[in-house]
Amino acid sequence: KKVQSYKVKGKKGKLITKTRTIQLPVIVKPGLLNNQDMLNFMVKYKPSLIFKPNSSFTYSNTNFSLLALIIEKIVGKDYPSYMKESIFKPLGMKNTSVFSKKDINIYQPSYYANNNPYNIEKFDCIYGDKNIYSTVRDLLLWDQALYKGSYIKQTTLQMAFEPGSNDKPSIHNYGLGWRMLIQPDQKIIYHNGWWHGNNSVFTRFIKDTATIIVLGNRFNRNIYKAKNIAASFLKGFDSTILAE
């Protein structure tokens, strides 16, 4: 199955490992945008790649937004419904959902550091790169399911934890949607988040089956200091090398 497409020069790269990243110019269409609006814009204006595929790495929300559209095309249903039926409901994640354009009437703002609310903005209804609203308890259910292999095969999970952004040698790398810090005795698998006033920390110590989960809805960079807890699991570990 195919989504709308356009050609760009260069070899193939992976959207999910950020080794093929598209430069998305500012979209001037009025009103709230969804994923299809974004794709329509790309098809029309054909934005170029930021770099030659597999030659470098840069984080890209656009890549994940495109992947959500690909999922919809493959499964034949919208991404929020697919996530609910395939992951959230089976794992008992009762307080987790994907926010989309149809949910604007129940929009709950996040907050600036000064407690002023963020109003809903142009890109707030695009999902895949963000817009999963959850709780610490629900995320722990998901985390434990990853350890148990109850809904994803361990072989598939290992693929996600393999380095994919190998543009330069480093202890830091990016897999299939996960950041990783490669240590002599284990990999620390993690991914922090930020959108408007929402901050999140999600760090997995696979060897110890331990996980740090922190969520906040008022912007505060101190949330990322939760990575300092990593020293409790790794003797002599310098937590400052974990990226925000």
Regions found by a protein language model. Give the residues of each.
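Short, surface-exposed loop or secondary-structure junction motifs
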Residues: K1-H196
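Glycine-centered structural positions embedded in regular secondary structure
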Residues: G177, G193, T211, A226-A230
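Short, gly/Ser/Thr-rich active-site loops of penicillin-recognizing serine hydrolases
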Residues: P184-D185, F219-E244
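Short acidic, gly/pro-rich beta-turn/loop elements at beta-sheet edges
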Residues: S170, I188, I212-V214, N222-Y224
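Short, well-ordered beta-strand elements
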Residues: V201-R218
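Short, low-complexity, polar/charged sequence segments that are solvent-exposed and flexible
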Residues: K153, G197, D208-T209, A231-G236
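Short, glycine-/Ser/Thr-/acidic-enriched flexible segments
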Residues: W195-H196, N217-N220
